[in-house]
């Protein structure tokens, strides 16, 4: 199939891997890809930077989760999600990052104004934002958002799910509510299918979530590998698919990764981003399963290159 269009797709940690794999295949195997598809990519490079950046990039996700649970001010809550996310994104990039960069040297006036806007876009009370020096950790957000409404927590990988903790007090949820729901659904399904349909009999436990540690990703530089692969191969295009309610690999962090992969901006027309009203696994929502598949089909059709050689 060397003459066929070639694509690789990776989800979550796999999103990081396919960025590196694209460069590896091209440089070591001389295999030139047509497309790289990243589903909820886990590019944690930004999380190792100062919190001024990583915390600011969380805000649009907070807006999405708060909107879903009806915790935003009426001015935002009464609008559609896709109307308010650009407002939160614009504030995060153009106002919040510069404010957070000042750290403890921000003026009291600016500190209070910033806390007010973070509260406005996140559903978290201004007093709580100030108590956290304008930096609300995601663990705390999942615990705090509904604390006074119903005492429930919200999920990490998909914040549409709710959980019930031992105590309403605390700074993080007791468990990831979405995980228990997925395990409850997937575990009996796969075990039934393997045994009854494939007739494969075994007592080995099927791990829905396999062990992934220990690992060392401190030297992760796959972004630049993908950039180089794209520079050398003008027919290589990239599609990123993210769920707005994913609190682990947030959609805005994925956008930031996309922007930073090509600092020159000369390949920006070869990057495509699609967002969905779901979490980490957007295909669990039937409407997004249909739309995500359609987006994939469109991407494949528009990136086949018809067998052209990799040259400008």
Feature locations, PLM:
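Residue-level signal for short, function-critical loop segments
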Residues: 12, 42, 244-245
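Alpha/beta-hydrolase fold nucleophile elbow
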Residues: 2-13
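A catalytic-pocket lid/entrance helix-loop region that shapes and gates access to the active site
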Residues: 22, 26-120
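Catalytic nucleophile loop
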Residues: 14-19
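Catalytic histidine-centered segment of alpha/beta-hydrolase-like enzymes
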Residues: 277-289
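Short alpha-helix in the alpha/beta-hydrolase fold that links the catalytic acid
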Residues: 20, 236, 250-260
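Alpha/beta-hydrolase fold catalytic core
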Residues: 102-249
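Short glycine-rich catalytic loops that host catalytic nucleophiles or stabilize transition states
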Residues: 38, 273-279
């Amino acid at each position: 199939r060397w003459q066929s269009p070639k694509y690789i797709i990776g989800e979550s940690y796999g999103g990081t891997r396919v960025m590196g794999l694209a460069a590896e295949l091209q440089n070591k195997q001389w295999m030139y890809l047509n497309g790289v598809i990243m589903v909820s990519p886990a590019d944690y490079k930004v999380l190792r930077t100062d919190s001024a950046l990583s915390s600011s990039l969380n805000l649009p996700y907070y807006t999405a989760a708060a909107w879903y649970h009806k915790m935003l001010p009426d001015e935002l809550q009464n609008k559609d999600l896709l109307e308010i996310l650009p407002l939160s994104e614009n504030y995060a990039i153009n106002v919040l990052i510069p404010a957070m960069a000042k750290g403890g040297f921000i003026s009291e006036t600016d500190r209070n104004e910033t806390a007010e806007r973070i509260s406005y876009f996140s559903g978290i009370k201004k007093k709580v934002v100030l108590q956290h020096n304008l930096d609300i950790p995601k663990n705390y957000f999942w615990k705090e958002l509904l604390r006074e409404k119903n005492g429930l927590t919200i999920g990490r990988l998909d914040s549409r799910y709710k959980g019930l903790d031992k105590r309403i007090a605390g700074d993080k949820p007791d468990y990831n509510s979405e995980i228990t729901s997925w395990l409850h659904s997937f575990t009996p399904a796969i075990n039934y299918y393997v045994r009854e349909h494939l007739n494969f009999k075994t007592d080995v436990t099927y791990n829905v979530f396999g062990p992934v540690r220990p690992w060392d990703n401190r030297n992760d530089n796959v972004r630049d590998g993908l950039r180089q692969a794209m520079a050398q191969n003008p027919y290589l295009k990239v599609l990123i698919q993210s769920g707005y309610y994913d609190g682990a690999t947030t959609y805005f962090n994925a956008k930031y990764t996309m922007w930073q992969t090509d600092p020159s901006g000369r390949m920006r027309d070869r990057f495509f981003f699609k967002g969905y009203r779901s979490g980490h696994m957007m295909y669990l929502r039937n409407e997004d399963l249909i739309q995500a598949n359609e987006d994939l089909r469109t991407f494949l059709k528009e990136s086949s290159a018809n067998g052209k050689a990799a040259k400008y």
